[in-house]
């Protein structure tokens, strides 16, 4: 990762050490492509003793822009897109022949993060409202995940749990985290407005709530590609009299805004699973400073549960604690889920078939590589 590697580092870059199924072809690899060759002595095989993977050579063609890569795929210059693309491309792909579209369930949950505990120098009367859990609850009630999935993802997504654990992780997903708020959206709006009528009852002529005579407006940090999300959140939050606006987060949002409490709300993607909770739960909910706990949440009971979950050697107890933690996360209304987006990727079928759909993965995955077969005559 050095921009000016010395001779020793250069040698290591071009002579990697590993035990995988393919090895780097240094003679054919360069700045525009990476070539891997299947190693004949790979230890895993199929039951009949044949190679586990059917692909002899993999060439990664490096493109700087996704639209160029998509054009190359449609023209037949490459076989597979090794990246997830926007759901906006689904209609385009559906019109093309010889394409396999993988619309796989995702593992990435988009959340709306509240700056509930900014450093003292970044506090102001409007931002102080976010310190009130009831105020955050009211905003959470106004979020309609189904509408976001329909309009932002073109239907290519699923509802996300308030406990931020995927329901497909059946061993430790806790459905109780999703029973804290009413299911019916109209009932949710009524409850949200009743809460806010107590906290900030005054409104302007447009129906937006006021604090000290000024409209309550929050800015949501996001990337240019997330402006659609903010636009539909504007519509939803207007129903409870709260104004939100998009704010570009720039190239280094952590240093510029997030680590320094210089934000109201921000969009943040999270992925939690058994393999990462020991590290990611503290980073998102416990650690202050330069961590993913952007809103600087402090909850001693939650912290204690996370700490015990990390260090217990009893797997049953770990699962039990994971189930206890999810409603605690949900009750904070700190990282409120918006949706879980599908992983959309595509491959050509005129040269190879046998592509597999795998949760959380693009079509370029281990299962596909094990099942690929060349089309007869090609």
Locate each region found by the language model:
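Long beta-strand-rich cores associated with HINT superfamily self-processing modules
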Residues: 347-378
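Acidic-aromatic pocket-rim loops
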Residues: 105-121, 163, 253-311
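Gly/Pro-rich hinge or "lid" segments in bacterial periplasmic/extracellular proteins
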Residues: 1-52, 57, 68, 189-190, ...
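Ligand-site clamp/hinge motif
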Residues: 8-13, 42-92, 234, 243-251
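Extracellular/periplasmic solute-recognition and catalytic clefts
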Residues: 25-37, 61-122, 146, 150-152, ...
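Extracytoplasmic/peripheral linker and loop segments enriched in polar/acidic and small residues
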Residues: 133-137, 141, 149-152, 185, ...
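Structural transition elements
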Residues: 18, 22-23, 159-204, 222-227
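Ligand/substrate-recognition segments at binding pockets and active sites
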Residues: 29-31, 64-65, 72, 169, ...
């Amino acid at each position: 990762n050095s921009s000016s590697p010395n001779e020793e580092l250069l040698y290591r870059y071009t002579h990697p050490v590993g035990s995988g199924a393919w090895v780097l072809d240094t003679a054919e690899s360069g700045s525009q492509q990476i070539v891997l060759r299947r190693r004949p002595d790979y230890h895993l095989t199929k039951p009949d003793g044949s190679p586990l993977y059917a692909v002899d050579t993999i060439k990664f063609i490096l493109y700087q822009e996704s639209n160029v890569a998509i054009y190359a795929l449609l023209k037949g210059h490459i076989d597979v897109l090794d990246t997830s693309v926007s759901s906006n491309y689904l209609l385009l792909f559906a019109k093309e022949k010889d394409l396999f579209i993988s619309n796989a369930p995702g593992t990435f949950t988009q959340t709306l993060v509240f700056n509930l505990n900014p450093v003292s120098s970044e506090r102001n009367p409007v931002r102080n409202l976010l310190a009130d859990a009831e105020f955050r609850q009211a905003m959470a009630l106004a979020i309609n995940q189904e509408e976001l999935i329909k309009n932002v993802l073109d239907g290519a997504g699923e509802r996300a749990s308030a406990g931020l654990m995927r329901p497909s992780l059946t061993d430790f997903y806790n459905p109780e985290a999703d029973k804290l708020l009413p299911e019916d959206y109209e009932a949710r709006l009524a409850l949200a407005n009743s809460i806010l009528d107590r906290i900030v009852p005054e409104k302007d002529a447009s129906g937006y709530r006021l604090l000290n005579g000024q409209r309550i407006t929050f800015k949501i940090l996001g990337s240019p590609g997330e402006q659609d999300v903010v636009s539909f959140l504007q519509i939803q939050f207007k129903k409870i009299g709260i104004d939100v606006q998009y704010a570009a987060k720039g190239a280094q949002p952590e240093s510029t805004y997030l680590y320094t409490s210089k934000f109201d709300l921000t969009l943040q993607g999270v992925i939690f699973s058994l393999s990462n909770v020991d590290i990611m739960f503290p980073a998102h909910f416990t650690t202050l400073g330069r961590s993913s706990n952007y809103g600087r949440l402090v909850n001693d009971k939650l912290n204690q549960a996370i700490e015990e979950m990390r260090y217990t050697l009893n797997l049953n107890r770990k699962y039990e604690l994971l189930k206890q933690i999810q409603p605690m996360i949900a009750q904070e209304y700190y990282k409120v889920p918006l949706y879980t987006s599908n992983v959309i990727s595509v491959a050509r079928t005129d040269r190879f078939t046998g592509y597999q759909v795998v949760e959380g993965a693009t079509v370029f995955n281990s299962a596909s590589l094990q099942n690929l077969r060349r089309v007869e005559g090609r």
